[in-house]
A protein has these predicted regions:
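Conserved small/polar residues in nucleotide/adenosyl-binding loops
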Residues: 110-116
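Alpha-helix C-cap/termination motif
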Residues: 19, 87-88, 113
Length: 120
């Protein structure tokens, strides 16, 4: 069984080692801003970690919305987050799909699957 925690991004390996965990989740950019993550300075340390790393995407992402002014930047931010996460071997990116609002399930399903199929 994997044991882990959502921990601060800075000194993540030291933090999870202190907690005796083998799995952790971090933010790689501010969770409440539209700014894309930058390449990690500690990429080699993260790549050498013998455990599971997950990245939590920013909270602002809403790929389910029919509003293009929100959905399009959400797709870009999700793609950029996945790209940086892949550079150090993250096992996955956790993302909340967002709110559909008006438009129904069919619209939201299309909006949710398009960016994930594009990123993957």
């Amino acid at each position: 069984m994997n044991i882990g925690a959502h921990i601060p991004s800075k000194n993540a390996i030291d933090e999870i080692s202190y907690r005796k965990g083998d799995t952790f989740q971090i933010f790689i950019s501010s969770p409440q801003m539209w700014k894309s993550p930058k390449p990690r300075e500690d990429i080699e340390i993260l790549q050498d970690f013998d455990g599971n790393i997950y990245v939590h995407a920013p909270y602002l992402i809403n790929v389910a919305t029919p509003n293009n002014k929100v959905r399009h930047p959400s797709r870009k931010l999700l793609k950029d987050t996945c790209k940086v996460a892949s550079t150090f071997g993250a096992k996955g990116v956790i993302v909340h799909g967002g709110s559909v609002g008006e438009g129904g399930d069919t619209v939201s399903y299309t909006h949710l699957t398009l960016p994930t199929n594009t990123v993957v």
